[in-house]
């Protein structure tokens, strides 16, 4: 049984890192969407 716990720790840690990275990407995307809705000129500037 302890071996099973050790093998599960690594995937859960990896999953947590991937989840955090995904949440950061979503936050950045939401920020860009909000910015484009509040200031449409940002879409045309190519920034």
From Swiss-Prot:
Its main location: cytoplasm. GO terms for molecular function: ATP binding. It is found in: Cytoplasm. It comes from the Eukaryota. One of its GO terms (cellular component) is cytoplasm. Disulfide bonds: none annotated. This protein is found associated with eIF-2-alpha kinase. Putative molecular chaperone that may promote the maturation, structural maintenance and proper regulation of specific target proteins. Belongs to the heat shock protein 90 family. This is Heat shock protein HSP 90.
